[in-house]
Amino acid sequence: AVMCSKVVRVYIDVFRDGAIVSFNRQNVSSLEVNLRASSDRFQVGDVTRTDVAQSESRLSLARADLQNAEAQLISSKERYIALVGSAPEALETPPPLPGLPDSPESAVAVALTDNPDILATQKARNAARYDVKVAKAQAAPRVSAFVSGSYLDYLNSENPLITSPSNKDATAGAQITIPLYQGGRPGALARQSVARESQAIEQATEAERSIIAQTRSAYASWRASLQSIESTRKAVEATALSLEGVKAENSAGTRTILDILNAEQEALNARVQLVTAERNAYVAGFTLLAAMGHAEARDLNIDAGPLYDPVVNYKRVRGKWFDYDFDATPKPVATNTRGTATQTADIPPVAKP
């Protein structure tokens, strides 16, 4: 689930950073048009040199922001290659996440039942309990049984002492061993096993605490991101209307160039905040599913089998008893990325569903 979470995170990052690059490119284009218009109006004395300087300043800052956004997109695409093994091309829009809980209590209840870390510590605790029983058994009596038989055939033997042509012999018995004194070894082993069982119990409690905290935190982040999406969507709509109004008022002479520049910056910031909130909500939702133990392919409705099957190799080797039945020389399975082209700031296209 950890690796899958990393892939989901970088996948959404590519989408987010591509959108931010697109917004910044649109902003640069708009500011270039605004600068040309300001320069033309300055030539006819409609605006001052200060207005032109403000337009130039905002354009320079916008170009710097665009360069930073493009660098971030390239970084996300390279991290995508490092995790997936291929460049992001024609990415599909991420599907809705299934099985998200209605409350933090229900999320914690599922996590305590299905989280693999909790299940692992429970198995370790049970194994430690059996180790204690094995250690205490060192001081208990032992009973063993034995059976043996033999058959000898002296047919055609020339030995005069042999009176019977064959001889059959069978032996059976039982043996009980009662340890009287072993130098304190059984007690020491038992105390050691009890200490390890105590450690396993505390580790299980620690894992449970950690998973509860992770689940509640992920739920809170997910809900906060959803609320942020609603707020920023309203902000995007409001800033778009505000920008149109400021431009109209500027044409009427009641607004300055600086007012337009500020309105455009606010509109850009709102759109960037929206795609960031959408990214955060998706990542937080997947993190919540992972904390609940529901980040497997079967939970996500992915028809690709389990992300990891721990019994595949066991089934492959469980019937092999030959001493020289070795495995073949291992070969690379992961994709080599040496031949992958260096990524650019080109926005990956979105695949059609």
Positions of the model-derived regions?
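Sec/SRP-type N-terminal targeting helices
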Residues: 1-3, 25, 50, 54, ...
